[in-house]
């Protein structure tokens, strides 16, 4: 992933309304949520919601699909996971800290003890 794309995605998620929208879509799961439901649940005016969704679509974090007259927003988990991986891929690589001081689990891969 390029630094510029990561920065753009993080900047868009840095806005409280867009972060609330994205978190709601993540809660809805891979099948997404109707735009009208997002508007009702989050209490965001339609024009404002459209603007913020457009920004998230623009950086690839959200996809829109139409089913007849109903518009759905789907979180792009692949793009979000790619962004998270970019943030954590260098975790503790330049550190002489013990494994105990590095974040556990998916934030870093286990170091090999082979030399």
Predicted feature residues:
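Short, hydrophobic-biased segments on the C-terminal half of alpha helices
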Residues: 53-54
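A generic local structural motif
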Residues: 8, 58-59
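Intrinsic disorder/low-complexity segments
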Residues: 44-47, 109
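N-terminal helix-turn-helix DNA-binding core of bacterial DNA-binding proteins
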Residues: 4-45, 67-80
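Alpha-helical residues within the helix-turn-helix
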Residues: 40, 57-58
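Amphipathic alpha-helical dimerization/coiled-coil segments
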Residues: 1-5, 23-27, 77-115
């Amino acid at each position: 992933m390029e630094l510029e794309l990561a920065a753009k995605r993080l900047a868009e998620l840095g806005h409280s309304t867009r972060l609330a929208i994205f978190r709601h879509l993540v809660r809805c799961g891979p099948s997404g949520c109707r735009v009208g439901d997002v508007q009702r649940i989050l209490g965001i005016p339609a024009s404002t919601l459209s603007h913020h969704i457009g920004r998230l679509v623009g950086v690839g974090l959200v996809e829109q699909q139409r089913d007849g007259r109903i518009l759905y927003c789907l979180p792009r988990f692949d793009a979000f996971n790619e962004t998270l991986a970019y943030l954590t891929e260098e975790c503790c690589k330049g550190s002489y800290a013990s494994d105990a001081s590095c974040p556990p689990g998916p934030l870093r891969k286990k170091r090999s003890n082979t030399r």
